[in-house]
């Protein structure tokens, strides 16, 4: 009996330690930024300019604005949880070829952006600051918000609180809590400080919504989009990319065909 009590105590201590680590270090478990020197030189085939945005707390955020000839509007792009614009900037060409300018934001702590991510609300405010800055240059009726992977929750939140032309979500999740619950079921959901409730934000999106997901996604399972599908409005669009994994979606010829049709409307 004494041995069982000792084992139970040890298991409890390990579990409490694991939960504590998950709570206090979750930024390191969710976000994987690549830092760039301030004098880093970006190289891309199309025209672009570097943009700085002052966040609410006066940290300076960094973005890239890619320019298209005879642009019909702007793609406001929110990228995934790893890397920086040094890599993510490569997606812009797909959209500039379709006559859309593209703005990409590096979240705080990513690329040349100052600071570090410390809260969900801070992230929301940063994205809104960048969006508000783009409104100085583009009419909102011509702005499409596009989120990829972890950026989908941020994109849906931003769309819910603004009046963009359209919302496009690539590999979205029902909520970050739901992802963690299935990936690491021993961690209580209440410990997660980044909820990113895409399902709640979609309910407030009045603009057309497009969900695009690969059915072989090994990072954000395809069933996450299937859970979101019932929340779509009558004229919203749900697209399945057969055989598509999590990475490389933008280069998928089927994705390009679908996005051509969507942006031609």
Give residue spans per PLM region.
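Short beta-strand/loop motif that positions the catalytic acidic residue
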Residues: 205, 211-213, 217
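Membrane-embedded segments
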Residues: 56-133
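Catalytic histidine-centered segment of alpha/beta-hydrolase-like enzymes
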Residues: 244-254
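Primarily recognizes the serine-hydrolase "nucleophile elbow" in alpha/beta-hydrolase
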Residues: 133-184
